[in-house]
């Protein structure tokens, strides 16, 4: 079992039961899934640009990404409906906890001038979004083998009803808020 999941079961659940006065253990919020997305704008002109992003994302997440396509055509961007413009991965279960553990304890501390993640990035429904400017903060990525520095978005979807509950859950998991 993942280390973060063990911590969640042993320490976080009892602490949150006490703090938010839940009647039932099933009411305690948990992380449902983590979606990692890379948008590759240059894939419009150069479809080969997507291969590097797919490769990076599969190394970071440990599973094969799905290629995302444009929903509608936008003439200003020379974009047609159905063109491949990025890739994403949805992590659940053990892989999700492993990824979160690596993100919180290894990757985020490697960001330059890092002072913590923004506490305002909750969506009002208990989900947290985080943008990462470069994929090189992950230890799995070999700096010499990358073709280009890319950013990625990480969305942590929780079962929390409010932002306050989700913030408490992520903070007790070790997410470094400012």
From Swiss-Prot:
Organism for this UniProt entry: Syntrophomonas wolfei subsp. wolfei (strain DSM 2245B / Goettingen)
HAMAP family linked to this entry: Ribosomal_uL5_B (MF_01333_B)
Pfam families: Ribosomal_L5 (PF00281), Ribosomal_L5_C (PF00673)
Protein known as: Large ribosomal subunit protein uL5
Key words of the record: Ribonucleoprotein, Ribosomal protein, RNA-binding, rRNA-binding, tRNA-binding
Assembly: Part of the 50S ribosomal subunit; part of the 5S rRNA/L5/L18/L25 subcomplex. Contacts the 5S rRNA and the P site tRNA. Forms a bridge to the 30S subunit in the 70S ribosome.
Summary of the function given for this chain in its UniProt record: This is one of the proteins that bind and probably mediate the attachment of the 5S RNA into the large ribosomal subunit, where it forms part of the central protuberance. In the 70S ribosome it contacts protein S13 of the 30S subunit (bridge B1b), connecting the 2 subunits; this bridge is implicated in subunit movement. Contacts the P site tRNA; the 5S rRNA and some of its associated proteins might help stabilize positioning of ribosome-bound tRNAs.
GO BP, sorted A to Z: translation
Domain of life: Bacteria
InterPro entries in the record: Ribosomal_uL5, Ribosomal_uL5_bac-type, Ribosomal_uL5_C, Ribosomal_uL5_CS, Ribosomal_uL5_dom_sf, Ribosomal_uL5_N
rRNA-binding keyword on record: yes
Family statement drawn from the similarity comment of this UniProt entry: Belongs to the universal ribosomal protein uL5 family.
Cellular component GO terms, alphabetical: ribonucleoprotein complex; ribosome
KW Ribonucleoprotein (keyword) present: yes
GO MF, one example: rRNA binding
């Amino acid at each position: 079992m993942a280390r973060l999941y063990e911590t969640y079961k042993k320490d976080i659940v009892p602490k949150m039961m006490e703090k938010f006065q839940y009647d039932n253990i099933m009411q305690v919020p948990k992380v449902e899934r983590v979606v990692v997305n890379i948008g590759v704008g240059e894939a419009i002109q150069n479809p080969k640009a997507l291969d590097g992003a797919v490769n990076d994302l599969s190394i970071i997440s440990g599973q094969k990404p799905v290629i995302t396509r444009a929903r509608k055509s936008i003439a200003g961007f020379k974009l047609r409906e159905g063109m491949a413009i990025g890739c994403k991965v949805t992590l659940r279960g053990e892989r999700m906890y492993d990824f979160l553990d690596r993100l919180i304890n290894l990757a985020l501390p490697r960001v330059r001038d890092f002072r913590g993640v923004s506490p305002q990035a909750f969506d009002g429904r208990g989900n947290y979004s985080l943008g990462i400017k470069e994929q090189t903060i992950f230890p799995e990525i070999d700096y010499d083998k990358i073709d280009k520095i890319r950013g990625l978005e990480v969305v942590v979807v929780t079962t929390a009803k409010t932002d306050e509950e989700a913030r408490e859950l992520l903070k007790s998991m070790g997410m470094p808020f400012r």
